Design a protein with these regions (language model features):
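Membrane-topology and secretion signals of cell-surface/extracellular proteins
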Residues: 7-8, 18, 26-27, 38, ...
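Non-catalytic surface loops within mature trypsin-like serine protease
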Residues: 20, 66, 102-105
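Short, well-ordered beta-strand segments in beta-rich or mixed alpha/beta enzyme
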Residues: 10-16, 46-77
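Short linear sequence elements within intrinsically disordered, low-complexity coil regions
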Residues: 31-35, 63, 68-69, 78, ...
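Intrinsically disordered, low-complexity acidic/polar segments
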Residues: 23-25, 69-71, 107-109
Length: 113
C-alpha cells in the first residue's frame, strides 16, 4: 500500500505493564504525559488496555506516513522508546523496544473516541 498524506503506512506498537492497583493512576498519567504529545506528531493513535488478574497491560498503536516521519519523532532510531519521567515508578518493567509493522490493509471502523 503506497503511503499518502491521508493514509498511514506504518504502525508503531508500544506495550507496558503495571499492577492492577496502579493501573487507573498510570492510565491518567500516561494519557496526559504520553498520549497527548503523541497525538500532535502521529497521523493517528489508539490506546488499549487489558486488565488481568494481577496486572494491567497498556498498548499504544501510533500510525505514521513513513519510517522517516517516525524517525523524526524519535530523533533518529524509530525503535527507540521515549520512557516517560514516571514510567519507572509505575511499570513492572521498562519496555526495551517497540514493534514496527507495515500497514497492509485497514477496513471498516477501526475505532475512535
Amino acid at each position: 500500500m503506497p503511503a499518502s498524506p491521508s493514509r498511514p503506512a506504518i504502525a508503531r506498537i508500544w506495550r507496558g505493564r503495571t499492577t492492577r492497583a496502579r493501573a487507573d493512576e498510570y492510565e491518567a498519567y500516561y494519557n496526559e504525559a504520553g498520549i497527548k504529545p503523541l497525538i500532535e506528531k502521529a497521523m493517528g493513535v489508539q490506546s488499549l488496555r487489558e486488565d488481568r488478574a494481577d496486572e494491567t497491560e497498556f498498548m499504544t498503536i501510533s500510525y505514521w506516513e513513513s519510517i522517516e516521519a517516525m524517525s523524526r519523532f524519535t530523533g533518529g532510531d524509530p525503535t527507540k522508546i521515549h520512557h516517560l519521567e514516571r514510567d519507572k515508578e509505575f511499570l513492572i518493567e521498562l519496555p526495551a523496544a517497540v514493534q514496527i509493522l507495515k500497514l497492509r490493509h485497514s477496513h471498516g471502523n477501526t475505532g475512535s473516541k
